[in-house]
Amino acid sequence: VTQICNLKCHYCAAGGDGTYGDPVTRISIEKTLPQLKFFIEQLKENQKFTISFVGGEPLLYPEAVKSIYDYVVSLQAEKKFSPQFSLVTNATLITDRVRDILKTMKIHIAVSLDGSAHINDIARPTKDGTSSTALTLQGVQQLKKIHSDIGSFGISAVTTKDNLNIVDTYSFF
C-alpha cells in the first residue's frame, strides 16, 4: 500500500523511513485493481492465494487496504477462488476509524513489537525519537476489541541482540 512508515526503525532496510531514497508515497489504486483482476483471472477454480499488506506502514492508508480487499472479494462472484488477507502493522495508527474498517474484513494481522518498551524502543522509535511502544500497545488493545470480527492477530518480533533473552521477552508477551 505504501513504502512510507511513521516510525524510524534502526534495522529498516528501506532507510528508516521506507522510501529507499525514492519519492514514492503510496500505490495507485487505479493501477493496482486491474493488475489484481489480471492475476485472479489466471487462477484455477478454488485456488487459494494470499494478499499481504505490508509497508512501510499500510495503515497510513487504511482506505486503500479496504478498497483492495473489497475489490478482490467482489471478484469472487465472477470466479471461484479462495483469497486470504494478511496485514503487518506497527499498530500505532489503530484509531476507532481504522478499527471500524478492519472489523469489516476477514484478515490476519501481525503486529510488529520486539518486546517491552525498554527493548522495543531501542529499535522502533518514532520519527522524533520518542517511544512507540505505548502507541503500539494501545493499538493492540483496539485489536482485542475486534478479535472475533477479524481473522486473527498476533505479534511479530524481530530478534536482535537486545531481545535475545527469550524468557524476558516471553514474559512480556
Model-derived features: where do they sit?
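Canonical Radical SAM [4Fe-4S] cluster-binding loop centered on the CxxxCxxC motif
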Residues: 1-29
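Short, surface-exposed alpha-helical recognition segments that flank or form part
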Residues: 23, 27, 59-60, 131
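Radical SAM/AdoMet-radical enzyme domain recognition
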Residues: 33-52, 61-173
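Short acidic donor-binding/metal-coordinating loop in glycosyltransferase active sites
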Residues: 55-56
